[in-house]
Regions:
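Extracellular S/T/G-rich loop segment that most often corresponds to the catalytic His/Ser-adjacent loop
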Residues: 28, 167, 283, 305-386, ...
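Gly/Ser-rich catalytic serine loop of serine hydrolases
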Residues: 191-203, 290-292, 364-377
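Mature extracellular/periplasmic domains of secretome proteins
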Residues: 193-196, 217-220, 235-257, 266-287, ...
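Subtilisin-like serine protease catalytic core
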Residues: 1-237, 311, 315-319, 341-345, ...
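Solvent-exposed loop/turn segments at secondary-structure junctions
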Residues: 30-31, 212, 231-235, 261-265, ...
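C-terminal subdomain of the subtilisin-like protease fold in secreted/lumenal serine endopeptidases
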Residues: 249-251, 255-258, 269, 316-322, ...
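A cross-family glycoside hydrolase active-site/sugar-binding cleft signature
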Residues: 229, 257-261, 288-289, 324, ...
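Sec-exported extracytoplasmic/periplasmic mature domains
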Residues: 207-211, 246-250, 254, 276-283, ...
Length: 451
């Protein structure tokens, strides 16, 4: 509150100059910002590959052998991801070519533009027309267009150029001593960075102004958003995540929404300490469960509420909620096909499919992901805290879990990888609470608890 914008001074003496709106831990003091960065698996591979590439393991101790096996796991994952992304790129290129050819054939057939209904009524008399009908039916039913194709190609290209490139590192932009994980004061006040689309979409879900006739309504009314930038286009770094959490706590956050995640966390202890700091200071943390279609009881996903080893740790943060993504479709497609799940590590689900929210330049867009589900829960927590300020963060967490909407007889398709066989299961086995966030019922429970 005491900070003055753009005067080059740390008016409130919190260590961060001109942080009127928040702070950016992936920018430099000169105003430059990190946009793309590598994935964590790439960084680990780049660090260990020179050591183990031609290693003679004959005389390795048990400890050395364990480290080597960890490297081989990383190497296999790294190479799998590269091959997978190349295959995706080739598939998209093939689809793009088929779309272009199919549209040419059908435009010629109909003598101009054609509707979905006309396409379905078409009785193809030759293989070429039948091919075109099948392709364009698939395209229209899945809302695929040239813009989406271009976006996906661009994303995959950048994955290969930056994310999986072991020779790429933008860290010099930040100018910190990266090896010093205790370093706190670096970065700049540019919370928007090169691309604020993801953060703006997430923030809108939690707290966009309600009932003003513009765009959409956020879950909570009259909330203050504190943007803290720590996630690039790539994987976030543990040091930045830890500092972002500490910054939010020290500057008065009641809820920390974390719409990010990754599969490796080489400096997990640093993040653990920051999570414990938030926990001890009564700040509720809401984390997106991830978009890998995986069971996080069995597959690592960070950050996590478990301190120490992911599987062996026995102590957990009390003020943590992990959120999976539910959808709007009934029946077996009720869960987002991309969503992570786990009846021990995912606490609840929230809407995260086709969510309409804010993006920069006064625009709106539909996105999907557990990144969209988490702020639904964060917004719910903010609402409860605003209406019932006597409630503690622990009570708010308990209320949210106690009030979920359950579906005891719902059978769904368990989220799975594209190359895996679909299997049916009960929605109840996907999370701790067995349900989906329910704001109305949460207020009913809060009213009783508050009184």
């Amino acid at each position: 509150e005491d900070e003055v914008a753009d005067n080059g001074k740390d008016d409130d003496e919190n260590g961060y100059t001109d942080d009127v709106n928040g702070w950016n831990f992936i920018g430099g003091a000169d105003g430059k910002n990190v946009d793309n960065d590598t994935f964590e698996v790439t960084r680990i591979y780049a660090r260990l590959h020179p050591k183990y590439e031609n290693a003679d393991t004959t005389n390795f101790t048990a400890e050395e052998q364990a480290k080597y096996e960890r490297y081989k796991k990383v190497e296999n994952e790294y190479r799998y991801q590269i091959n997978n992304k190349l295959q995706q790129y080739n598939n998209i290129q093939s689809l793009e070519q088929s779309m272009q050819r199919g549209d040419e054939i059908l435009t010629d057939y109909f003598g101009g533009s054609y509707s979905y209904e006309e396409l379905q009524e078409l009785q193809a008399q030759d293989q070429e027309t039948a091919f075109a009908k099948n392709v364009m039916t698939y395209v229209q039913e899945n809302d695929i267009d040239s813009t989406l194709i271009a976006e996906q190609k661009k994303q995959l290209y950048e994955f290969m150029k930056y994310g999986y490139n072991p020779e790429f590192s933008p860290r010099d932009i930040v100018g910190d001593n990266y090896d010093d994980k205790s370093e706190r004061y670096y970065g700049n006040p540019d919370v928007a960075g090169p691309d604020a689309s993801h953060g703006t979409h997430v923030a809108g879900i939690a707290g966009a102004v309600r009932d003003n006739g513009l765009g959409m309504n956020g879950v909570a009314a009259n909330v203050l958003i504190m943007p803290v930038r720590a996630v690039p286009d790539g994987d976030e770094r543990d040091k930045d995540v830890a500092n972002a959490i500490r910054y939010a706590v020290d500057n008065g956050a009641h809820v920390i929404n974390m719409s990010f995640g990754k599969s490796y966390s080489p400096y997990k202890n640093v993040v653990d300490e920051a999570i414990q700091y938030a926990d001890e200071n009564g700040v509720l943390m809401v984390h997106a469960a991830g978009n890998s279609s995986e069971n996080t009881d069995e597959t690592e996903n960070y950050p996590t509420d478990t301190y120490g080893d992911y599987f062996e740790g026995t102590t957990t943060a009390n003020l943590w909620l992990s959120v999976g993504a539910s959808g709007w479709k009934p029946g077996d497609e009720f869960v987002g096909e991309f969503s992570n799940y786990g009846d021990q590590r995912v606490d609840l689900f929230a809407p995260g499919v086709d969510i309409y929210s804010t993006i920069p330049d006064n625009k709106y867009k539909r996105n999907q992901g557990t990144s969209m589900a988490a702020p639904v829960v964060s917004g719910t927590a903010a609402l409860l805290m605003a209406y019932y300020p006597d409630l503690t963060a622990a009570q708010v967490r308990s209320i949210i879990l106690e009030s979920v909407k359950t579906y005891p007889n719902l059978k769904i398709i368990i989220p799975h990888k594209a190359d895996a066989e679909p299997t049916e299961g009960s929605f109840e086995v996907l999370s701790v609470s067995d349900g989906v966030v329910n704001v109305y019922k949460a207020f009913q429970v809060a009213e009783k608890m508050s009184n």
